């Protein structure tokens, strides 16, 4: 049933903080930067890529909500 499905990654506070900090300066990463971050945080490239994809979607959703609230 769960063949091939990865378990959900839980990030440490430090990892989340570092990822958020990076996102604040840049919403998109180059491959080189993604590799650097992955090495620094002991995560793999795919985890970084997916975290940024998810974070961009959250940012987009939050932006839409802010606009709606200001009307």
Swiss-Prot record:
GO terms for biological process: anterior/posterior pattern specification. It is found in: Nucleus. SUPFAM superfamilies: Homeodomain-like. One of its GO terms (molecular function) is DNA-binding transcription factor activity, RNA polymerase II-specific. Pfam families: Homeodomain. InterPro entries: Antp_homeobox, HD, HD_metazoa, Homeobox_CS, Homeodomain-like_sf. Residues 4-63 bind DNA. CDD domains: homeodomain. Keywords: Developmental protein, DNA-binding, Homeobox, Nucleus, Transcription, Transcription regulation. SMART domains: HOX (SM00389). GO terms for cellular component: nucleus. Belongs to the Antp homeobox family. Sequence-specific transcription factor which is part of a developmental regulatory system that provides cells with specific positional identities on the anterior-posterior axis. This is Homeobox protein Hox-C5. It comes from Notophthalmus viridescens.
């Amino acid at each position: 049933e769960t063949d091939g499905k990865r378990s959900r990654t839980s990030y440490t506070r430090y990892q989340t903080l570092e990822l958020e900090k990076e996102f604040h300066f840049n919403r998109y990463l180059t491959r080189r930067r993604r590799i650097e971050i992955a090495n620094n945080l002991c995560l793999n490239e795919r985890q970084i890529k997916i975290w940024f994809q998810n974070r961009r979607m959250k940012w987009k959703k939050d932006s839409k909500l802010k606009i709606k609230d200001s009307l």
